[in-house]
């Protein structure tokens, strides 16, 4: 009786049977590049071939890192080659760490460097802005502030000789109404600087007329252009008015500039 012949399957069928119908993943290294070829099914249940190309580069790493790469893998990755395996290893997002020293911490905690804190304070309405940008500038609020400062400066000038401090002889003569030995009274004169080039005598008079009566005003002008040199002198009839002018106008914003007002220095004979 003839025996039953067994039909042997081809080696290709056996390979597909062992790997679930998909060929195994292969790696090939050529000319400094590694080519990884793998097969998988797409969403339409069709077999697809995926080829990934990696560029091989060499870099210097610390000894501890190089030693860690020689460790024996275990578990499902026991037979894997050195390096991460995409099937068992997931690389998370890169986290950049920033280390701050104590000086930077102190600088960060400095309240003066806080960008949310406004250091400007208006002298007219006490708002968080400069006085030159105050919306109430020139209104009744500003006028009342100037009157209060003038009254305070006048009272301070009157009470000054009663404090027991030394008063120069020429100041005593000016308070009595005399000119002393100088022949010219500069005790009630002030110097206003940081004026704009477009300043005129009318503007200067308008600036100081509310403070007190003046005996003389001088606006320094350039001989060639006729423009203001940036400073002027004002002689008041009373020293208390001059003191009030310094108190009110010094640091006051005028024509987009901050005025600087001080006592006029006496001329040397």
Swiss-Prot record:
<dbReference type="GO" id="GO:0033290">
    <property type="term" value="C:eukaryotic 48S preinitiation complex"/>
</dbReference>
<dbReference type="Pfam" id="PF00076">
    <property type="entry name" value="RRM_1"/>
</dbReference>
<dbReference type="GO" id="GO:0001732">
    <property type="term" value="P:formation of cytoplasmic translation initiation complex"/>
</dbReference>
<dbReference type="InterPro" id="IPR017334">
    <property type="entry name" value="eIF3_g"/>
</dbReference>
<dbReference type="GO" id="GO:0016282">
    <property type="term" value="C:eukaryotic 43S preinitiation complex"/>
</dbReference>
<dbReference type="InterPro" id="IPR000504">
    <property type="entry name" value="RRM_dom"/>
</dbReference>
<feature type="domain" description="RRM">
    <location>
        <begin position="188"/>
        <end position="266"/>
    </location>
</feature>
<keyword id="KW-0694">RNA-binding</keyword>
<dbReference type="InterPro" id="IPR012677">
    <property type="entry name" value="Nucleotide-bd_a/b_plait_sf"/>
</dbReference>
<dbReference type="GO" id="GO:0005852">
    <property type="term" value="C:eukaryotic translation initiation factor 3 complex"/>
</dbReference>
<comment type="similarity">
    <text>Belongs to the eIF-3 subunit G family.</text>
</comment>
<protein>
    <recommendedName>
        <fullName>Eukaryotic translation initiation factor 3 subunit G-1</fullName>
    </recommendedName>
</protein>
<comment type="subunit">
    <text>Component of the eukaryotic translation initiation factor 3 (eIF-3) complex. The eIF-3 complex interacts with pix.</text>
</comment>
<dbReference type="GO" id="GO:0003723">
    <property type="term" value="F:RNA binding"/>
</dbReference>
<dbReference type="GO" id="GO:0003743">
    <property type="term" value="F:translation initiation factor activity"/>
</dbReference>
<dbReference type="InterPro" id="IPR024675">
    <property type="entry name" value="eIF3g_N"/>
</dbReference>
<dbReference type="InterPro" id="IPR035979">
    <property type="entry name" value="RBD_domain_sf"/>
</dbReference>
<dbReference type="InterPro" id="IPR034240">
    <property type="entry name" value="eIF3G_RRM"/>
</dbReference>
<keyword id="KW-0963">Cytoplasm</keyword>
<keyword id="KW-0648">Protein biosynthesis</keyword>
<keyword id="KW-0396">Initiation factor</keyword>
<comment type="function">
    <text>RNA-binding component of the eukaryotic translation initiation factor 3 (eIF-3) complex, which is involved in protein synthesis of a specialized repertoire of mRNAs and, together with other initiation factors, stimulates binding of mRNA and methionyl-tRNAi to the 40S ribosome. The eIF-3 complex specifically targets and initiates translation of a subset of mRNAs involved in cell proliferation. This subunit can bind 18S rRNA.</text>
</comment>
<dbReference type="Pfam" id="PF12353">
    <property type="entry name" value="eIF3g"/>
</dbReference>
């Amino acid at each position: 009786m003839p025996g039953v012949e067994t039909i042997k399957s081809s080696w290709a069928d056996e390979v597909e049977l062992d790997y679930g119908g998909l060929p195994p993943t292969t790696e090939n290294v050529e000319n400094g590049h590694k080519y990884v070829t793998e097969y998988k099914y797409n969403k339409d249940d069709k077999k697809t071939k995926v080829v990934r190309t990696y560029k091989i580069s060499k870099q210097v790493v610390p000894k501890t890192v190089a030693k860690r790469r020689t460790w024996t893998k275990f578990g499902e990755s026991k037979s894997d080659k050195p390096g991460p395996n995409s099937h068992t290893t997931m690389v998370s997002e890169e986290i950049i760490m920033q280390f701050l020293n104590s000086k930077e911490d102190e600088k960060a905690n400095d309240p003066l460097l806080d960008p949310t804190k406004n250091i400007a304070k208006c002298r007219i309405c006490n708002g968080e802005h400069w006085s030159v940008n105050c919306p109430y500038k020139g209104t009744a609020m500003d006028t009342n502030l100037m009157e209060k400062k003038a009254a305070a400066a006048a009272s301070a000038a009157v009470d000054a000789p009663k404090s027991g401090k030394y008063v120069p002889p020429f100041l005593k003569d000016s308070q009595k109404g005399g000119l002393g030995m100088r022949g010219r009274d500069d005790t009630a004169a002030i110097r206003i600087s940081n004026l704009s080039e477009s300043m005129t005598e009318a503007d200067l008079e308008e600036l100081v007329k509310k403070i007190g009566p003046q005996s003389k005003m001088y606006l320094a002008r350039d001989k060639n252009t006729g423009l203001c040199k940036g400073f002027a002198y004002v002689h008041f009839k009373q020293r208390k008015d001059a003191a009030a002018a310094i108190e009110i106008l010094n640091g006051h914003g005028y024509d987009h500039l901050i005025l600087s007002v001080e006592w006029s220095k006496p001329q040397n004979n």
